[in-house]
Amino acid sequence: MTGTAVTPSRAEFIELAKLHTVVPVWTQILADLETPVAAFIKLVGEGDGFLLESVEHGERWSRYSFVGRNPRGTLTLRNGVLTVTGDVPASVPLDKGMLAAMEELLRIYRAPLFPDLPPLQGGLMGHLGYDVVREIEDLPNVPRDDRDL
């Protein structure tokens, strides 16, 4: 381990929090004997989480691994109905589609960028399936979702 110093300091955090609704807090840990998947299992366990790997310039190995756990809230759009699990701000519209909800979340959660950190420093995680295009374009219905995806 390279140290247990946490960045930013408490004083820096307080100043950053005056301008931003979310402030990344981090420390560096030497993990030469850990794989990203092993770290994910140890950090997330049986709960909800994600593991993202970065690849730069077509390299085979990733430069960064991003692990997230215990989402504060989730949004799910199924059959045109947007549902919320967990804690999502009241100003997030649930009757205007996924894109409007995400736009409001991005407006609310503003974080500073730290040049010494990897490009992904937190924020919204998830995926948008192809069908979200129906919020922009009028397309015919697709076959029934028999796999509950």
Question: What spans do the regions from the language model cover?
Answer:
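Signature of the chorismate-utilizing enzyme
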Residues: 1-149
